[in-house]
Regions:
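Catalytic DNA-binding helix-loop module of base-excision-repair DNA glycosylases/AP lyases
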Residues: 642-645, 656-668
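Single-stranded nucleic-acid-binding OB-fold domains
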Residues: 118-122, 126, 136-290, 308-309, ...
Length: 996
């Protein structure tokens, strides 16, 4: 790497040769006068012919400076000049007249092709050449003088211009593999049908990985897809260190690749063997709304509509970018996008109108299960918080009481809960547009129109399918479609009701149309291909163009003026209660009862007066627990556990609740988080070990009380309270409890209804989207119906377009959401049946009511409502069974039994040898006896036991910490422990170990 300052005496301008990259044969130049710099460089063309690239002020000027510039890997020089420079007269450079490096074996090119010097040849030539400032040709030709001091490249170009190469050198050229930029025409991947050499393709990285092989080799594989097809790309590296240069290749990145296409013996298909790779130019969809006064979209569907594809963040970001004063969210029959939309609206500063496209039926049906219900679409928009709560109530009623294949809304119900809501006439499926389509009289149309706050018209493409419907024989041309919209506008004027132009957007941009075709193909009948309307979000200009058949003033009125007026009537509201406030249920005297039971239990265990360490820990925990309103949560957990204990079942606590001493004293967990200690159950003599010399209380040796001779209890696992509720004790407690699976879990669920009231307890709802494998099947069905053939990589690319769209709803297996008695559930969420199944069948086949869940996914409201995790688990059930069989109390089993502990390092206590175990198992862990022990029986954990040979309970706890999480043990703690650098107790096994 060399740096020089070059001055042109003739022009008086200064050009700075910022860097000479000897690896890439590139010059990076900064100049005040670009034109003068170009003249100087052109005068130097003979001397700089060996360079690959020349960058001037960040631009590649290679071709401009020297059109015949030779670059490694590309024989661009005329044959005579190339031969003179690098031919037979040069003993260091060979020539191959028959084939290029990229040509397949046995094939000859029609024209002689010269083999170019290797990069090492060029590097050696540069190294052997005299310094640039000593070359007379430069000063004689261009009148250039040199000085060695100049500013660094970093001081001239922004940091974003640099890419770190594998060798640690900064590069600005985007080259990922190879020595130069890729030249040549880019081919569509779909054109690759046979083996060929030197092909160039560009596409999106669908997935990539670098797999280590034997003998330090490495195989890089990449799934690449463009807009036509996909192909697997490979690159072998003799040294895995050389593969580091491709660590910058990531999923969804755009890359350009050159290589040879060959039939791969492993995959059986064509594979592109990579010779060069660089970052490609991503084809971004970049639509803009340039209108001075933009419109408002009042009809839009997110992925929560079964047929919608609009991503929540994409629509809010786009609306903000387009400076739309508001955007409405109106999914089909649901409002499940609201929680995330609220967060995104705050993030982007975008006003959102919260609404829904409902299914209107004329009257309350006598038989809701009738298949003959005629429904119409209707838009509901919330104007204020009252309207929002009424919208929630309508959603609940439509899902719980009036659900028949879809959530229906009887007209009387809409009248009852109209306060705070605006009703729009919706699309071609709305009752008003249907009446227009059917040719109803003006009087009837005006009567229908007066039910709505505004009428809708949409682009002709949305309704173009009417041209092909036999039952609408009168609709034959686009002009007929225009007349339908004109009729809506006419009736709106007569009735004094504003008319608004809406997109009925189901996908964001026109380029996403194929994604929706793929999504809807799942409902196509085999062999029947359906076309779908272009229901994408229009810009203001596009919408005005859609209604250009109207007078300009009228088009602007329905597209801009009226939509903005509707938006102005809707306040800025938040669908959920304030994010920072948690509404916990109230139980009279819960705080006092919790405090009293804790001190009572502490005195029972440790005597009175309480030791200072006990008093301090109780004060540390009880103060923030009560001050932050969490006392009731502890008390509820205490009641649930006690109810199960009284029935003879143990309850297992999960997660970090064991770090709370208050939870221990309240009987919520049997884990004691105090420092390891002895305590006498008779006279309360105690001894605490706070110097870290003991890993846990269960590791202490058996000992009798020095005061009274009673066998001492041993306890304490030294867990800080901050692990559970944070350093300030302000984290919402997450108390997960394992109840005995089967009867006891069901009883615990029933007991919550007794505690809080049946009408205040609901199962936590979940929302399931289309998963990758299902989306893959959608694409295959789409292709098969159309007689298309896609390879798996291209299918994987297309499936990403439909993945994540809502598929169904469900319930958390253990989550219970509790609404305070003095609050309405509709302050938080609507309700529905899980998977919309109003009726289920029990084991006998009898019909039983379905499970009522929250309409919103429980994650979005768990910080606002109390969520109880009442899990069913086999362990408490098995422990109870063993207690019944043996008569041994599980709470009095010793944790330092020598034979039991020996199982984690040897099978001898089982009465079998390692050889017998090896014959039976035949894999790792043959020298330990843990194969039948839960959490320790897998080959991975048995291998850990062989490496560590744990000797006590606290070491077993650390093993469990090491075995959970990515790279906690492998490539981390294992290497440190087996190399002897640290002892097991010194390695980080859990977050508790990371303390200052």
């Amino acid at each position: 790497m060399g740096k020089y300052r070059l001055k042109s005496k003739q022009k008086g301008s200064v050009i700075t040769l910022m860097e000479v990259d000897t690896e890439c044969q590139a010059w990076y130049i900064q100049a005040d006068d670009r034109n003068a710099a170009l003249q100087v460089l052109k005068a130097m063309s003979d001397e700089i012919r060996c360079l690959r690239n020349i960058y001037l002020n960040g631009d590649d000027v290679t071709e401009e400076v020297c059109p015949l510039l030779m670059t490694i890997g590309d024989a661009s020089l005329p044959e005579e000049e190339f031969s003179e420079m690098y031919g037979a007269g040069n003993p260091d450079v060979g020539m191959d007249m028959h084939r290029t490096e990229d040509s397949p074996e046995g094939e000859a090119d029609s024209e002689p092709v010269f083999k170019l010097p290797s990069i090492r040849d060029v590097q050696a030539a540069i190294a052997a050449a005299p310094p640039v400032e000593d070359r007379p040709a430069l000063s004689q030709t261009a009148g250039i003088s040199f000085s060695s001091e100049l500013p660094s490249l970093e001081s001239v170009l922004p940091a974003s211009a640099f890419q770190l190469s594998a060798s640690g050198e900064k590069r600005t050229d985007g080259i990922l593999l190879g020595r130069s930029h890729i030249k040549g025409k880019i081919s569509d991947i779909s054109t690759i049908r046979e083996e060929q050499g030197g092909i160039v393709v560009q596409g999106t990285v669908i997935d990539c990985e670098c797999r280590e092989l034997r003998e330090n080799r490495c195989l890089f594989t990449m799934k690449l897809a463009d807009e036509t097809d996909g192909i697997l790309c490979k690159k072998f590296f003799e040294k895995k260190e050389d593969a580091q240069k491709l660590t910058g290749v990531k999923k969804n990145m755009t890359v350009k690749v050159r290589g040879n296409v060959q039939l791969d013996k492993f995959t059986g298909g064509l594979v592109l063997n990579i010779s060069q790779m660089e970052q490609g130019k991503e084809k971004k969809i970049n639509h803009e709304d340039m209108a001075e006064t933009p419109r408002v979209e009042l009809h839009l569907h997110t992925k929560m509509s079964l047929d919608g594809l609009i991503d929540n963040e994409e629509i809010i970001r786009t609306a903000a970018k387009w400076k739309h004063p508001a955007v409405a969210i109106t999914d089909h029959g649901v409002i499940q996008a609201f929680p995330q939309i609220q967060t995104l609206a705050a993030k982007y500063g975008q006003k959102v109108i919260y609404g829904m496209e409902g299914y209107l039926i004329d009257e309350v049906p006598e038989d809701i299960d009738s298949d003959r219900q005629q429904y119409s679409h209707i838009i509901l928009l919330a104007k204020n918080i009252t309207g929002l709560r009424n919208l929630y109530r309508l959603v609940t009623l439509s899902h719980l009481k009036y659900y028949r294949k879809r959530p229906l809304l009887p007209r009387p119900l809409l009248e009852e809960f109209r306060d705070g809501l605006m009703y729009g006439s919706a699309c071609v499926m709305g009752e008003f547009f249907r009446a227009v389509l059917n040719g109803d009289s003006d009087e009837e149309l005006i009567r229908l129109a007066k039910f709505y706050d505004y009428l809708e018209v949409q682009p002709l493409g949305n309704n173009e399918f009417l041209l092909y419907e036999d039952k609408y024989a009168a609709i034959m041309t686009k002009k007929d479609l225009q007349e339908l919209n004109k009729k809506v506008i006419e009736i709106g004027e007569k009735a004094g009701i504003p008319v608004c132009a809406t997109s009925d957007a189901h996908y964001l941009f026109a380029e996403y149309a194929r994604d929706r075709d793929i999504l809807l193909s799942n409902w196509e009948k085999p062999g029947k291909i359906e076309s779908h309307p272009p229901v994408y979000l229009r810009t203001t200009e596009e919408m005005l163009e859609e209604f250009s058949y109207l007078p300009k003033e009228k088009a602007e009125e329905i597209v801009i003026t009226n939509t903005r007026r509707v938006a102005e009537q809707c306040e800025v509201i938040e669908p959920l209660a304030e994010e920072w406030k948690s509404y916990n249920p109230k139980i009279a005297g819960a705080d006092d009862k919790l405090k009293a039971m804790c001190y009572e239990k502490a005195v029972e265990l440790y005597g009175e007066p309480l030791p200072e360490i006990i008093r301090d820990r109780l004060d540390l925990e009880l103060t923030p627990i009560i001050n932050h309103g969490y006392g009731v949560l502890y008390y509820i957990a205490h009641k649930l556990v006690k109810h199960s204990n009284d029935r003879g079942y143990l309850v297992g606590s999960r997660g970090s609740v064991g770090s709370s001493f208050v939870a221990t004293l309240a009987g919520i967990t049997e884990v004691n988080p105090l420092p390891p200690h002895y305590v006498c159950p008779h006279c309360h003599w105690n001894q605490f070990f706070t110097d870290g010399s003991v890993g846990g209380g269960f590791d202490l040796a058996d000992k009798k009380c020095p005061n009274c001779g009673t066998e001492l209890n041993k306890d304490g696992h030294n867990i800080p309270f901050a692990v559970f509720l944070g350093f300030d004790g302000d984290k919402v407690p997450d108390i997960d409890l394992n109840f005995s699976s089967g009867d006891d879990q069901a009883v615990a669920h029933k007991y919550t209804e007794e505690l809080f009231g049946r009408d205040n307890v609901f199962r936590a709802g979940t929302i399931a989207g289309i998963q990758d494998k299902t989306a893959f099947g959608f694409v295959k069905r789409y292709a098969e119906n159309r007689g298309l053939t896609f390879n798996d990589i291209f299918i994987e690319k297309l499936s990403a377009g439909v993945a994540g769209v809502k598929r169904t709803t469900g319930q958390h297996p253990a989550g219970i959401m509790v609404c305070p008695r003095d609050m309405d559930i509709h302050n938080f969420t609507p309700l529905q049946y899980a998977a919309n199944k109003r009726w289920l069948k029990d084991e006998t086949g009898e019909k039983i009511p379905g499970t009522i869940t929250t309409h919103f996914d429980y994650h979005s409201i768990s910080g606002r409502m109390l969520k109880l995790d009442i899990l069913g688990h086999d362990d408490p059930k098995v422990i109870r069974m063993l207690q019944d069989i043996t008569g041994i109390d599980p709470l009095h089993i010793p944790f330092n039994d020598e034979k039991t502990l020996s199982l984690f390092s040897s099978p001898d206590a089982l009465g079998i040898t390692s050889e017998q175990l090896k014959a039976a198992v035949g894999d790792k862990g043959i020298t330990v006896g843990a194969i039948g022990l839960p959490e320790f029986g897998t080959p991975f954990v048995r291998g850990m036991l062989e490496d560590t040979r744990p000797k006590n309970f606290s070491e077993l706890v650390r093993i469990s910490g090491f075995s959970h999480g990515t790279n906690v043990w492998l490539n981390n703690a294992r290497d440190l422990i087996t190399s002897g650098k640290v002892k097991q107790e010194q390695a980080i096994s859990t977050r508790d170990d990371i303390r200052i």
